[in-house]
Every structure is written in C-alpha cells, then in structure tokens.
Amino acid sequence: RFTHKYEVKPQFCVINFDDPRHSHRCNPINADFLTDIADAYEAAYVIMIGLNRSWAQKQGDFFVESPVVLLTAIIWFLRIYQNGKYCTFPHAIELLNKKYEEVFTILMARPELENYLSAFVDAWQGGAQEQLQGQIASAKIPLSRIISPALYWVMSGDDFSLDLNNPQAPKILCVGSNPDRQNIYSAALSLYNSRIVKTINRKGKLKCGVVIDELPTIFFKGLDNLIATARSNRVAV
C-alpha cells in the first residue's frame, strides 16, 4: 500500500520456525556481524540467557559464565575458520556436541583462543574430569532443546540480512513465534532480536518501527538502550 513512498521497494521477509516452507532463511551470527570476539560473546550470552532466563540474575557465577565462554570460543572459531564459511548457529551446536577431547584440540590450535579457554584446558589436563564435564554439560543440555531440523534450516541461510532499514535494501520483517514452543523458539528469537537492535539503531538509516507482541516471552537484550536512544536515529518502538 505504501511501497510508492520508498525510493527502493522494501523486501518482505518472514521467519517462521513452525513451517519453514513459508519462511526465509537468515543467519543471525553471519560472519559479517562478528568483527571481534566480543560480538561472539554477546551472541553466546543472548542465546544461553534465552534458554535459561534465571541466569540473567546470576552473571559471574561459575556455571553461568562457563557455558557462555565455551560457546563464545566455538562461535569465534567458526568465524575465523575459512573466513566464516561455517559460522552458523547450527554448526556451533554440532561442534559443541563432539567429544570434548576433539573440540579442545581443534580450538586450542588457534592462538587467539588459548587464554580464553585456559580454565577448561587446565581442568582437562589436570584430571578434573567431573568439573570439566559439568562445565560442558551446562552448555550442551540447554542447547539440545533447540536441535531441530526446522530451526537449523532457517538459521543457516542468508536469504536476507538484518540491516532492515538499510536505504539501499530496506526490508519489512515479520517474526513469528508459538506459545506452545516458547522454551524452544524464544532463545532463537532473542538472538535475532539482539542483532536487529544493533543494526537498526544507527545514523544514516531509514525511519524504522519495531512492534513487539508478547514481549515477556522472550529475552530482548538491548531493548532498554534502544528505547532510550532510538529516537535520535528515527527508530520507533
């Protein structure tokens, strides 16, 4: 109805985990989004808190930080391996679920990850197997909830990017959820939301609106900052 008001006609995109046949594909940890290991940490943090909402009140706890750090290392490895060719969330989950001896051998081959993983390697080489397995399980068990062919398919493609208000390629994105699968979908949606918030709240972009329904069902990192600062960047929430 209002497409004539855009200099470039916007693309209409949908994320639908229930029926991937009616969904576009979008990789929320596309290598282009990850310019520093801090970006990988944020992605890992969002997904783990999305799966364990109570962890948001326990930042700094050993068994909260451990899975976040481990997942961060895996995501960053995928980012720097072959220029991010396999940097998708499904690849990260599958790598995490390999034998930990194989995983740490692969990760420690990267000098930039040695210090990041020192606590895990010390436990491994020091014979603290129970502690190490507990650390790894605290990442594996929550993430196992989102091992799904539908989620894997949607989250591993690049039909569109999340810079929705890009003047050269504007997009209208509709993201669907399902209250019956809230514990599964909310974590994945939280990752998309955090990425969108970072990309749209910038100077030089088109006017943009964010409409959120049933907000309490998802962890939306950065929403408070978006509300506080978005007006200057012509973003309405």
Predicted regions: what they are:
Residues 1-236:
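P-loop NTPase motor domains
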